[in-house]
Amino acid sequence: MRPMSRLPPFFAADGDRFVPSASARGPWSARHQHGGPPAALLARAFARHVGAEAQIARLTFDFLRPVPLAPLTIATRVVRAGAKVQRLAGTVLAEDGAAVIEATCLVMRVTPDRVAVPLDTLAPPAPPAESAPFELPFMSGDEGYHRAVEWRLAKGTWGRGPVAAWLRLRVPLVAGETPTPPLECLVAVADSASGVAVAVDPARATFVNGDLTIALHRAPAGEWVCLDAATTGEAHGIGLARARLWDTTGLVGRSLQTLLLEPRAGG
């Protein structure tokens, strides 16, 4: 049974605004949000444009500036409405009206049993029940994103190369909306791949991602998401975090983050 959390939901809806709680706080500043929850708000808004015979196949988020731990508004629009492919765009706006995240969404029509495809032969990660609970060492405190998410290590050793970890939200994305839909759960945690499989020592360097791309070949199911992640970086300061995305029924898609690697002051 899923453990109950006393932490508040990531957001409370207030008219057309979404007011964040401490659960949305990220790792780099107490004044800023983790990128996952506000990105999931955009996914939530995009999903409302998607009909029963279509699926979100790709989401790309550009993080334009740190997302403040303050009320946000979401704006979406249809860029192209096609019979087979639909393109959407969206923006997360801060209280001052500045865009903090811009996103695009590719929606594709789905037709059951339309084509025959070979089964994926990748070995799945150990299931959540067989994976050990763990915490990210570089995130501390009694409140924050790291507490609002449950973490289980399925493969590898944190800080030593590729790692597979199961994540699930302990709190709703939006207050009063339970259960959180699987797509929103996936987007809320996919931004954590670079923290699951770190390329640098977080005590000595930061690894802020400027973007997040999620490509899905099928719709996710359930609340658990596995990030089978690996990160590479260069001494000149650019890194890439990539992950296979799984749910408990199989492979769902892939994610990619572009990282800015910078030494900490005195690091």
Task: Mark where each language-model region is.
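Terminal targeting signals and extreme-terminal segments of soluble enzymes
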Residues: M1-G267
